[in-house]
């Protein structure tokens, strides 16, 4: 909806989903400097900035067409969507996301976010639990572990990724 309004993006349980491509970001220098403490080479830098912004209640969207949609065959999004179609690649994404969630975001809210961070902690804990259960499903292929993931369905970046887990584990082998 392009009504030319500035709206705050709220932190949600599926905060690992990055809603906007990095080429559209406007970033405070302070956040960029702070990100240097938390960035690791395996983390996409735009995802780090998006997630740090969410944790600090500092992500806003201006609803207007500012750039034309660009679809690059070599973009991070295109590479990730092709790359994550195997069990091994998915396990690696879960491992990196777990490390990011449990280390970087945990440190961020403890040391660099002012005020009450109980909601942020709840989101991090919920994602930690979800990623752990998801990894166990991938490692064991146990169907009951897959069903147990329904309790964390709102952590999935997209609902179709839950179905994709089942496809990779049960059908694609």
Roles of regions detected by a PLM:
Residues 114-173:
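Membrane-interface aromatic/basic loop that binds lipid-linked glycans or pyrophosphate carriers
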Residues 3-6, 36, 41-44, 102-128, ...:
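Short, structured coil/loop segments at alpha-helix boundaries
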Residues 44-53, 84-86, 100-108, 121-143:
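Short flexible/disordered coil segments
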Residues 3-5, 10, 69-73, 78-115:
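Catalytic core of nucleotide-sugar-dependent glycosyltransferases
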Residues 2-83:
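Conserved nucleotide-sugar donor-binding catalytic segment
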């Amino acid at each position: 909806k392009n009504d030319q309004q500035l709206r705050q993006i709220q932190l949600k349980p599926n905060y690992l989903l990055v809603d906007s491509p990095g080429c559209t970001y406007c970033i405070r220098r302070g956040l960029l400097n702070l990100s240097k403490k938390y960035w690791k080479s395996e983390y996409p830098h735009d995802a780090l900035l998006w997630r740090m912004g969410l944790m600090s209640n500092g992500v806003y969207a201006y609803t207007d067409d500012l750039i034309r949609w660009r679809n690059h065959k070599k973009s991070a999004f295109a590479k990730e969507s092709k790359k994550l179609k195997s069990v091994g690649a998915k396990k690696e994404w879960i491992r990196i996301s777990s490390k990011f969630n449990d280390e970087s975001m945990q440190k961020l809210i403890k040391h660099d976010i002012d005020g009450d961070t109980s909601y942020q902690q709840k989101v991090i804990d919920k994602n930690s639990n979800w990623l752990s259960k998801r990894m166990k499903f991938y490692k064991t292929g146990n169907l009951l572990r897959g069903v147990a993931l329904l309790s964390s369905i709102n952590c999935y970046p997209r609902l179709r990724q839950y179905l994709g887990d089942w496809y990779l584990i049960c059908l694609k082998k």
